[in-house]
Amino acid sequence: MGMVHTTGPAPSFGLSDGDDPIFNPTATSSYTGPVRTESDSLGSMDIPAEAYWGIHTARALNNFPITRRALSNYPDLVRALVRVKQAAALANKEIGAIDADKADLIVEVCEEIYNGALHDEFVLGVLQGGAGTSTNMSTNEIIANRALEKLGHTKGDYDHFHPIDDVNRSQSTNDAYPTSVKLAMVFGLQRLLEEHSLLTQAFRNKGAEFHDVVKIGRTQMQDAVPMTLGQEFNSFGTTLSEDHERLSEIIPWMCETNLGATAIGTGITADSRYAEAASRHLAELTGLPFVTAPDLIEATSDTGIFMTLSGTLKRAAVKLSKICNDLRLLSSGPQAGFGEINLPARQAGSSIMPGKVNPVIPEVVNQVAFTVIGADATVTAAVEAGQLQLNAFEPVIASSILQSLAWMTNSFRTLRLNCVDGITANRDRLAAMVASSVGVITALIPVIGYEEAAKLAKQALATGAPIRELVVQAGLMSFEDVDAALQPEKLSNSGG
């Protein structure tokens, strides 16, 4: 094992630049450099000598030629995988299940990878059969071969440092992988919440800026009653803050781990002290409240927490998409639409219509929301498809939610920086719309009564005359009293 030699074309170890989105599973690698031979229970394979991954990774590369979206494209997952391996090594060292020097070396190598080293060695596609076994085995191989290198041995010389006996000690894919997936999602969720807070504040800032801009509110796309543009934008911030609370509440739930459960939750091959020690070390390494699940068999078979997170992300995406619908509608025009607000011009909007500018930022956020909705449907189906003591479909759950987290985070950022921060109000147009709207008559009902208000509203619609003038002409109020009643703070019930 580990002997290096040269061979002809080797089996396919990766995907070529041209086979995404359509991959040709019969394609072979053009690699002709030095290789080493590794063996497993199925036989032997030649592995590129310089690769840190090994035979289990090579088999998975051949078995799952589905996508070029490799594990290396999910740095949060790579970082989470090695954090879990660190916690396992520290727990094994504590209980005497592994030599202290080996445990320390695992921790050292994992820290290198956590800080960005060897991420390009995580070559497997994120979608795979086997409930994540290939990902776990590949991680073990990369850590073991880097450890061998640091010890002065040849990669693949597993007699000195073994991917399973050492790196995977006291673990199964069925506890190490789901714990890593949860941790990766928490990493992504923390970043999402940071951007979410900034976007929420951006809407509230606009609410303060537009506090004195009166407009007509609408229900069912029909003119309703006056409000301020500031109230409208502040409401956007409020609805986002509610989602922030719901998403934040999920983090402690994600920190319930089944480490120590091993294969199905019975803890076979793991010392009885390992589970608590592993969770404790993971909590110390991450600063997160990781604890051991009270029922490890249930925790190994159940994936409901992923559906909770995905559903909450969908809720946040749908609500933000509705806000983007409003931004597009309020900015429609510029001459023949609502034209109440101006979105920052980001790029030319047409190859045939000069001067056209489209609301491209809200549009892309809408599309992210559509994708998140689809991802949630995928997660729901995958969670339902679990059988007996394990759900085999966590890889698609992981890829779906991690993509949703990343895309939503990016959409929050671009919406804030490239749209919300630069929105301006068309104050003159809004004032003219308020002056010509019959909706303001509602504000005068306490003075003139409903019946008189209804008559004047009908007259205004028939003649086009402003409500203000009709009220004065009817002798019901003076211009001064009408203007006082139509002050922004009274129209919007915001004070005064």
What are these regions (language model features)?
Residues 2-496:
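Conserved, well-structured ligand/cofactor-binding cores
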